[in-house]
Swiss-Prot record:
InterPro entries: GrpE (IPR000740), GrpE_coiled_coil (IPR013805), GrpE_head (IPR009012). Residues 1-49 are annotated as: Disordered. It is found in: Cytoplasm. This is Protein GrpE. The gene is grpE.
Amino acid sequence: MSEEKQTAEQVEAAEQEEVTEQAEQAASQEQHEETAGQEEALQHQIDELQGLLDEKENKLLRVQADFENYKRRSRLEMEAAQKYRSQNVVTEILPALDNFERALQVEAESEQTKSLLQGMEMVRRQLMDALEKEGVEAIEAVGQEFDPNLHQAVMQVEDENFGSNIVIEELQKGYKLKDRVIRPSMVKVNQ
């Protein structure tokens, strides 16, 4: 009986060992499945965070580009404002300059009138010098090809002495401030 008892105990121990082994395997499999689930959840979180990071980086790049464009635009506007700061004053002075030129076209009959015209010419010259220092220059018109950016045609005539589309007379001087036309020349153009 002692052998039978030992055998029964061995069988029971073997069965218990098998049950324990199966329980350990089940627990290990559950733990593995749980770990795999956690890994999957963590990978999903990583993917979401990476997507969010990419989105924020793109937004940052757009904001930086917008800011650079703003700085460039502001700089260009400041440069233009500095370059053309005197445009309003020049525009207001041009009619007075036109009047000087009209007055200087008068024929001087007496010494007093000649003296007055010389004084007016000196004032006109000083005024023109000051304007030129600011970058104002008269637009060349007579003999030039008509350019709608520089000239305003107020009359058209036919004259065989001039080519087609050539300015033959300037009725009012035009002026540029640096590279910007502030007043186009009023001209007579040959057809």
